[in-house]
Swiss-Prot record:
It comes from Chlorobium phaeobacteroides (strain BS1). It comes from the Bacteria. It holds the Pfam family RrnaAD. Belongs to the class I-like SAM-binding methyltransferase superfamily. rRNA adenine N(6)-methyltransferase family. RsmA subfamily. Its EC number is 2.1.1.182. SUPFAM superfamilies: S-adenosyl-L-methionine-dependent methyltransferases (SSF53335). Keywords: Cytoplasm, Methyltransferase, RNA-binding, rRNA processing, S-adenosyl-L-methionine, Transferase. PANTHER family: DIMETHYLADENOSINE TRANSFERASE (PTHR11727), DIMETHYLADENOSINE TRANSFERASE-RELATED (PTHR11727:SF7). HAMAP family: 16SrRNA_methyltr_A. This is Ribosomal RNA small subunit methyltransferase A. It catalyses: adenosine(1518)/adenosine(1519) in 16S rRNA + 4 S-adenosyl-L-methionine = N(6)-dimethyladenosine(1518)/N(6)-dimethyladenosine(1519) in 16S rRNA + 4 S-adenosyl-L-homocysteine + 4 H(+). S-adenosyl-L-methionine binds at residues 20, 22, 47, 68, 90, 110. One of its GO terms (molecular function) is 16S rRNA (adenine(1518)-N(6)/adenine(1519)-N(6))-dimethyltransferase activity.
């Protein structure tokens, strides 16, 4: 097991937590600049680690909250950055609605590779409590978020996030600026929840998207026929595969379907 030491604090890097610590302060400042933070913003940092991004955020926002699961790192941040409120907890278990009681959150963070998708879906579920997200993640996942119809990266994650948020790929981050060095590069992505009201059954829509991509090589007809009445569909050729449809076409198709009784 690798160990990382910084300012007399040593931790055994937990691979299962996806702990790779950003070391380049110029990259951290670029992330903060991209987020366009203001002094009074309600910032929530996910997994501050040894505080590289924390330092850059504090240059703009003097007081904010950070969530850190690792006990040693949480204590380090408390001691090193007294103005940062540290919640020692698994981010996936935190109540974002409660944290947003004084204003919508600006989410920042270098999120762990191992739980990137669960974090993204938690943020999606809580998007009404969020003003913006500026997140660093595995480059491959970032590409999937902004993928276009017809590409191999286009799938459930792209459709669901692009339906409810404006997603922008900002810039790539080389693996050499992390300790320990990961096997892949990273990228920074901006996610801004849309303010428009979703005029359909959101849970039903998200289940429909998952079902549409159930088996990628199958047509929409074959993926959907067990679960929906397809007789009213007129807008989409159901011989197509899900990866061919735009977000708008998914919405149109969903409104033409009727779930079959259990």
């Amino acid at each position: 097991m690798k160990k990382i030491e910084y300012k007399h604090t040593e931790i055994a890097v937990k691979k299962k937590l996806g702990q790779n610590f950003l070391t380049d302060q110029n990259i951290c400042r670029k992330i903060v600049e991209s987020a366009q933070l203001q002094e009074n913003d309600h910032v929530l940092e996910i997994g501050p680690g040894f505080g590289a991004l924390t330092t850059a955020i504090l240059e703009v926002v003097p007081r904010f909250t950070a969530v850190e699961k690792d006990r040693i790192l949480a204590e380090f941040i408390r001691n090193e950055y007294p103005s940062v409120r540290v919640i020692e907890m698994d981010f996936l278990k935190i109540d974002l609605e409660e944290l947003a009681s004084e204003g919508r959150l600006r989410i920042m963070g270098n999120i762990p590779y191992s739980i990137t998708t669960p974090i993204l879906f938690k943020l999606l579920d809580n998007r009404r409590n969020i003003f913006s997200e500026t997140l660093m993640m595995q480059h491959e996942v970032a590409r999937r978020l902004v993928a276009s119809p017809g590409s191999k990266e286009y799938g459930i994650l792209a459709v669901q996030l692009q339906t409810f948020c404006d997603v922008t790929y900002l810039f790539k981050v080389n693996r050499t600026v992390f300790k320990p060095r990961p096997e892949v590069d990273s990228a920074v992505v901006s996610i801004i929840p849309k303010t428009a009201i979703f005029d359909a059954d959101e849970t039903g829509f998200r289940n429909f998207v998952r079902t549409s991509f159930g088996q990628r090589r199958k047509t929409l007809h074959n993926n959907l026929k067990k679960y929906y009445d397809l007789s009213m569909v007129t807008s989409i050729d159901l011989k197509l595969r899900a990866e061919s449809l735009s977000v708008e076409q998914f919405l149109t198709l969903f409104k033409e379907l009727r779930p079959l009784p259990d």
